[in-house]
UniProtKB/Swiss-Prot annotation:
Phylogenetic lineage: Bacteria, Bacillati, Cyanobacteriota, Cyanophyceae, Synechococcales
CC annotations in GO: DNA-directed RNA polymerase complex
InterPro entries in the record: DNA-dir_RpoC2_beta_pp, DNA-dir_RpoC_beta_prime, RNA_pol_Rpb1_3, RNA_pol_Rpb1_3_sf, RNA_pol_Rpb1_4, RNA_pol_Rpb1_5, Rpb1_funnel_sf
Family under the similarity heading: Belongs to the RNA polymerase beta' chain family. RpoC2 subfamily.
Record's protein name: DNA-directed RNA polymerase subunit beta'
SUPFAM superfamilies documented for this protein: beta and beta-prime subunits of DNA dependent RNA-polymerase (SSF64484)
Subunit structure, interactors included: In cyanobacteria the RNAP catalytic core is composed of 2 alpha, 1 beta, 1 beta', 1 gamma and 1 omega subunit. When a sigma factor is associated with the core the holoenzyme is formed, which can initiate transcription.
CDD domains from the UniProt entry: RNAP_beta'_C (cd02655)
GO biological processes: DNA-templated transcription
Organism: Prochlorococcus marinus (strain MIT 9301)
Catalytic activity field: RNA(n) + a ribonucleoside 5'-triphosphate = RNA(n+1) + diphosphate
Length: 1366
């Protein structure tokens, strides 16, 4: 057995940290001793250990039998016990009422703090939620104790406790309280569900709790997809990591540090990288030994804190991992086998919990964001900080002022005076919160500190909350807020608070003024009820004649006629038809216009009011329209109304009759292309109106159309003549020759026709319509006046059809229409034109059409309308039919004061009208009697409990208005705390009404704890996303220097580096500095808070190290630092969800993400700047450069996210099958890439055996057999795996056991012909080639290794094109 496999005897069952069983280290390890479980409760965990022990010591068969026996035992007693669950088993603990009572007291205290403006709305919310969360936790403990002491055999308790069904959080909901719920946006509702399912939920609680349940189901569905995609990307990035070597021989390793002296499972299955000695220099574990639980225990016992182990991160095997760096395969706890696809196992191990985690969202329904690590004082005494302590002020999320530790130190509570004893020591880590001062004396059981364990980064998100005003009044800022104007990218200016401070609203009665009102009273005047505060007037814009209309609703309309136009030479004639009234306009010369609108309606500018009914332009049938030259229309077509004529001329009309028919062809009564007379029946019940040649259009034996074209038909066979005309038709002017014997005196339309009998020309007559330039209309009037709009009528001729249009119709159509349209000038859009019918002044029997332009003014009636307007009083200033000039006042409105008080106007910005004013009433003030001198000044703002004089405290919040000897007057107000960076919606001095938004608080909150937050976080880490608002990192190591600016807010932070170079960092407002003045920092350390950008971190590490070490070392070390932090970040997310994943899986993935470097300067190598290439290849290239004396390549390490890494893999087949197939394939084609088929995916895709598992041995042995006595050509992939593509993977070769060199000992020895064909296929000249595999091996041709640079290495570089042939 190899040394790496532990002996059977040492393999005792794995104990978990908190298992109470005998520790195998305190008990001599006997091979066959089962874990003791005498007189113990065997729960799920103990069963696990028992089965695991049986499996490890006795193998599968025995374990299976034992498990069967356990099952029988279990079923037997479960049957006899008949445990069932009933309502009576759900026992609610007595303590519940007290706990809820305490929580409610705490919460009402918090609400009071909020009312006094001591904490912000956000802090109140957080505090309420945390109070409930804590109550919930305490209630769970109460439930546990209740069952444990009073009813240990309760069915519910037994089920949950044994792990058979259910868990504590579900029992909590049954008998404790359901707890806090989240709303659909994921925000926690601050009303918890206080009842449990045993007591029953109220309707409100039921609705709230059903939110969570539905959300859980939906989330599960969505997350399963997310998690599956994550697994796919992971598999793709790691699929070609296979264990290909026994030992890579690396000297590098990673260090694992103990947590609290314990390693837990973190060393299990790893190989030591060097001998481990204890304090007395005794060897505990030799190098290259696999650490099993027993050894891990011994290391802990020898109190060794750091162990160097081998890891896939540091493995130097090319494109794979070697057995020793990987350690145990976790499936069977032995060293991993060659050919194991560890990449895929790693990918599945990380991806699979993602699915589970998603599934595990909604069982509890509740959501918690509890605070942890609170330390209370155990004794009464005095607080002492140690000498190196550094603290700074900090405000907790609950609005408590506390101190935050900047460095780690020890805090002591020293007993004072008589009660001596041991002092209590508390270790405070950097970033922890302290609630006591140095030197303060405290009692026992006081919260002293909240210790932050390590750097647990919960993911935070920025959130906002509105502060809504509860009372009307005037806004006042505290000085400390220091509002600052911030302009965003869109140029919007917002006010932001820079510091924590209060925003006050001082009470008063706020009046909204109507749009055009102006105050008529000055600020500071006292007013009584009924005093006029402001006046608004409404005036006419153009002037004219007033018409008062009846009032509608709460306002009445005043119309002012600015322009009117009466059509005196038209009579308005009304006709009644069955479809309603029709109005015609008749002019004195008898032309009649049809009116499109009825009197009493409104029309707008440019609208057509009447059409001329003109019979001259009406045809008898359908036909074809042609414009003769000279006739032109305006381009723009308003399709409804046709084309406006711009110049008159002649319109040509070729009549033809079209019957649209959709009937069966059997009904046709005539023949196609035949001449028919007018009145012929063409189809049953359809008669032709004209004579002419008939054309029938049919489709699938259905008649579509029948066309009758009039004219005369002339037979003609002369090609020359026929070619002059088309089937569509040509116009022929009078006197032009058409055919011999045809004399044309007028315009004809000629078409070429082929009838069944012969060919010929159809000559059709053309009708001419003359269109005038201007419509002939009776005189029309234009009305003008000094100011305001004019009115006019305009006639427009419009052609209905465009040039060349065919109108399919039997009835006649109208070719030209004449419209009358309204023209008004300078009309404003809100002015409409009204159409009225009036009697003629001279003859009452005749009605005339009257057009008027009205200006309409709505005047409000006096109402006690909404309270904020105050009571208004409106007066009309005009009478009916009065003539008013432009600008005359029509009505005035006064706003009256409702109660006695003092007026204040807001601050006026120039040109802006005042829209609100405030009256400070008696009820907005309060007098406080004092007996001694006041300790406050006028203008001070106080809250409940602040001292007014030595003996009197304030009873309300507000601002001091006046102070006399015996009393102080306070104007009531309400403070609102505003946190830094909040957006202020109001300015100092603004007037607000109740319900207005005052500010938008910006705060960070922890996202609700759930793997939901876990999955995106894992994705963010593995995709190496750049976080927003990331922390500022120190670029190089040095000493921090913090300078305060002129105002206390601005701080400049710089780091003095080694060569006294000062590097200054720009700080954004709202960033907390995480370092203190004079502190030593290393490159890559966070200077401010925020998420860390991994790319930036790598750069900082690398730049810091490359000044101190050679490039390759700096790259290696910076990469390994980054790898360590990535592994621990990923682990943190999974640990916080209670999922255990072995480090080595994450290491395999992280290794794939960090294997590449980017070439910055190629030196003398054949690499390209910007190329991504493996660090190992660059290293080899640079070594070769060192031999030949060329300039080496310079590079920086890069971090690729898993998607990027998958697309940048060497195998283009694998990359193309993952994403962006066309791009990957075209690039590969352009670069002329080869795919060496190293991974699993490539081989699967082209249908070969995969090079892992059983396929691996064949792969390796074939290669060794081909390599013959030169196994070194397998070392570098150029010789070895490149040949793999030519091998048939389906046969294997047995190697002889003795390492023999003679050529006869090789079994599958290629014949000379084989060698020859292989050489030819590869174009190899045996004389110049040093390819051992192609030459006949014999015993003499072996060099001693040290004579040459390693030929395999150089050869490989040439092959890869990284080294030129010199």
């Amino acid at each position: 057995m190899t040394s790496s496999k532990p002996k059977k005897t040492s393999r005792v069952r794995k104990t978990t940290k908190n298992s109470k069983k005998n520790n195998p280290l305190t008990m001599p390890a006997l091979a066959k001793t089962p874990p003791s479980f005498k007189n113990k409760v065997v729960d799920k965990k103990a069963l696990k250990n028992l089965v695991s022990w049986a499996y490890k010591t006795h193998g599968t068969a025995v374990t299976a039998a034992m498990a069967d026996n356990l099952k029988d035992l279990g079923f037997k007693y479960a049957t006899q016990a008949a445990v069932s669950i009933s309502v009576d088993d759900l026992k609610v603990p007595e303590a519940k009422q007290d706990l809820i009572g305490q929580a409610e007291e705490q919460i009402s205290a918090t609400e009071e703090c909020y009312r006094l403006g001591e904490i912000t709305e956000v802090e109140r919310h957080t505090k309420v939620i945390d109070t409930w969360t804590e109550t919930n936790e305490r209630l769970v403990d109460a439930v546990k104790n209740n069952f444990n002491q009073n009813d240990p055999l309760n069915s519910v308790w037994m089920m949950a406790n044994s792990g058979a069904r259910g868990n504590m959080s579900q029992v909590r909901q049954l008998v404790g309280m359901r707890g806090l719920m989240a709303n659909p946006q994921g925000e926690i509702i601050d009303l918890p569900i206080r009842t449990n399912f045993r007591e029953g939920l109220t309707v409100t609680e039921y609705v709230i709790s059903s939110y969570g349940a539905r959300k859980g189901l939906v989330d599960t569905a969505l997350r399963t997809a997310d998690s599956g995609y994550l697994t796919r990307r992971l598999v793709d990035v790691a699929q070609d990591v296979i264990v290909r070597e026994e030992d890579c021989g690396t000297e590098r390793s990673i260090v694992v540090e103990a947590e609290d002296g314990k390693f837990g499972a973190r060393l299990l299955g790893r190989l030591t990288a060097e001998d481990i000695f204890d304090a007395e220099e005794n060897l505990v574990v030799p190098q290259n030994t696999a650490i099993d639980p027993a050894l891990s225990g011994e290391i802990e016992k020898a109190s060794i804190n750091k162990v160097k182990i081998r890891s896939p991160l540091t493995c130097e095997a090319n494109r794979s991992v070697c057995r020793r760096c990987y350690g145990w395969a976790l499936a069977h706890n032995h060293l991993v086998d060659l050919g194991e696809a560890v990449g895929i196992i790693a990918a599945q191990s990380i991806g699979e919990p993602g699915t589970q985690l998603t599934m595990r969202t909604f069982h509890t329904g509740g959501v918690s964001t509890a605070e942890s690590g609170v330390v209370r004082s155990k004794i009464t005494g005095k607080v002492e900080f140690s000498s190196k302590a550094k603290v700074r002020g900090y405000r907790t999320p609950h609005g408590v002022e506390a101190k935050q530790a900047e460095v780690d130190f020890i805090l002591k509570i020293v007993p004072q005076g008589s009660n001596s004893g041991k002092p209590q020591k508390i270790e405070v880590s950097s970033g922890s919160l302290l609630f006591v001062e140095d030197g303060e004396e405290i009692n026992s059981d006081i919260t002293v500190a909240q210790i932050i364990a390590g750097t647990v980064k919960k993911s935070v998100e920025k959130a906002t909350k509105d502060v809504i005003c509860d009372l009307a009044g005037q806004v006042r800022y505290d000085k400390v807020i220091q509002p600052k104007e911030v302009t965003d990218r869109q140029g919007n200016i917002t006010l932001k608070a820079q510091r924590l401070g209060r925003l006050w609203v001082l009470a008063g009665d706020v009046y909204n003024l109507p749009p055009n009102a102006r105050p008529v009273i000055s600020s500071g005047k006292s007013v009584d009820e009924g005093t006029v505060l402001a006046e608004a007037s409404q005036s006419s814009e153009f002037g004219g004649q007033v018409r008062l209309r009846e009032s509608v609703g709460d306002s009445r309309e005043v119309q002012i006629v600015t322009t009117s136009m009466s059509l005196t030479n038209f009579k308005l004639i009304e006709e009644s038809t069955h479809s309603g009234q029709i109005y015609n306009l008749e002019s004195s010369d008898g032309i009649s216009y049809r009116l499109n609108i009825s009197p009493g309606s409104k029309i707008s500018n440019g609208e057509v009011i009447a059409d001329l009914t003109d019979e001259r332009f009406r045809t008898k049938t359908g036909g074809l329209v042609k414009y003769a030259p000279g006739l032109s229309v305006k381009k723009a077509r308003s399709s409804k109304n046709g084309f406006e004529v711009s110049q008159g001329g002649t319109l040509l009309w070729i009549p033809q009759e079209t019957h649209e028919i959709n009937k069966d062809i059997s009904l046709l009564m005539i023949e196609d292309m035949k001449w028919i007379e007018a009145g012929t029946e063409v189809v049953k019940d359809i008669f032709s109106q004209t004579s002419g040649i008939v054309t029938v259009t049919q489709k699938n034996d259905i008649l579509r159309e029948i066309t009758v074209r009039n004219g005369t038909f002339h037979e003609c066979d002369d090609e020359e003549v026929l070619n002059r005309f088309t089937e569509e038709g040509n116009l022929v002017n009078p006197g032009e020759k058409i055919l011999d014997g045809v004399d044309n005196k007028e315009i004809l339309f000629v078409q070429k026709l082929e009838t069944p009998k012969c060919r010929g020309l159809l000559l059709r007559t053309v009708e001419e319509f003359t269109i005038p330039d201007q419509a002939e209309l009776p005189q029309l009037s234009h009305v003008k006046q000094e100011k305001g709009p004019h009115l006019g009528l305009k006639a427009i001729q419009r052609l209905t059809y465009k040039d060349g249009e065919l109108i399919k119709s039997v009835e006649g159509v109208e070719l030209l229409r004449t419209h009358l349209s309204i023209e008004s000038f300078d009309a404003t859009p809100q002015m409409t034109i009204d159409v009225e019918s009036i009697e003629d002044k001279n003859d009452a029997s005749i009605n005339r059409l009257n057009l008027v332009i009205l200006e309409s003014i709505l005047v409000r009636r006096d109402t006690l309308s909404d309270s904020s307007h105050g009571s208004t009083h409106t007066e009309l200033q005009v009478k009916n039919d009065q003539l008013v000039k432009a600008g005359d006042v029509i009505a005035t409105t006064q706003i009256l004061c409702k109660e006695k008080g003092f007026v204040q106007l807001p601050n006026v910005v120039e040109d802006e009208p005042i829209r609100r004013l405030i009256v400070e009433r008696e009820e907005d003030k309060i007098k406080i009697k004092i007996s001694d001198k006041a300790v406050v000044k006028i203008g001070d703002r106080v809250v409940d409990g602040d001292p007014i004089s030595k003996s009197v405290k304030s009873t309300s919040c507000g601002e001091i208005e006046e102070i006399s000897n015996s009393s102080v007057t306070l104007r009531l107000g309400r403070p609102y705390m505003v946190s830094p960076d909040s957006v202020l919606h109001v300015k100092d001095g603004d007037l607000v009404l109740r319900g207005d938004g005052l500010a938008l608080l910006v705060f960070e909150r922890q996202k609700t704890g759930d793997i939901v937050q876990g999955l995106p976080r894992i994705e963010e880490l593995l995709e190496a996303r750049r976080p927003r608002d990331s922390a500022i990192l120190s670029k190089k190591s040095g000493i921090v220097q913090i300078k305060k600016g002129n105002d206390e807010e601005s701080v400049s932070l710089s780091v003095i580096e080694k060569d006294d170079f000062v590097n200054e960092y720009q700080l954004l407002i709202g960033k907390n500095i995480m370092v203190s003045d004079g502190q030593q920092v290393t490159g890559g350390e966070s200077l401010t808070d925020g998420p860390i950008n991994p790319h930036e971190l790598l750069d900082c590490y690398f730049n810091d190290l490359k000044d101190q070490k050679p490039l390759i070392e700096a790259a290696r070390e910076s990469i390994s630092k980054l790898q360590r932090s990535m592994v621990s970040e990923v682990q943190n997310v999974y640990k916080s969800q209670g999922v255990a994943i072995d480090d080595k899986h994450i290491e395999v993935i992280v290794r794939q993400m960090t294997s590449k470097v980017r070439i910055e300067d190629a030196g003398d190598t054949t690499l390209l700047p910007g190329e991504l290439i493996e660090l190992r290849q660059v290293e080899d290239t640079n070594q070769a450069m060192a031999i030949t004396g060329g300039a080496p390549a310079e590079f920086t390490p890069v971090l690729l996210g898993i998607t990027k890494a998958s697309l940048n893999t060497d195998s283009f087949i694998s990359a193309a099958s993952f994403q962006e197939t066309t791009r990957v394939l075209t690039e590969a084609a352009i670069e002329g890439k080869s795919d060496w088929l190293r991974g699993l995916k490539e081989n699967v895709i082209i249908g070969r055996l995969i090079p892992a598992g059983t396929g691996f041995s064949g792969f390796v042995e074939e290669l060794s057999s081909e390599a013959g006595p030169h196994p070194d050509i397998l070392a570098e992939e150029s010789g070895g795996y490149r040949r793999a593509q030519n091998l048939r993977p389906d046969y294997t070769v047995d190697m002889p056991q003795s390492p023999s060199v003679s050529s006869t000992a090789i079994l599958d020895d290629p014949s000379d012909e084989d060698l020859e064909t292989t050489r030819n296929r590869h174009g190899i000249d045996p004389s110049s080639s040093n390819f051992a595999a192609f030459a006949r091996p014999n015993a003499e041709n072996q060099f001693s290794e040290d004579q040459l640079p390693d030929p395999a290495a150089l050869e490989g570089l040439q092959e890869e094109g990284l080294l030129s042939d010199e």
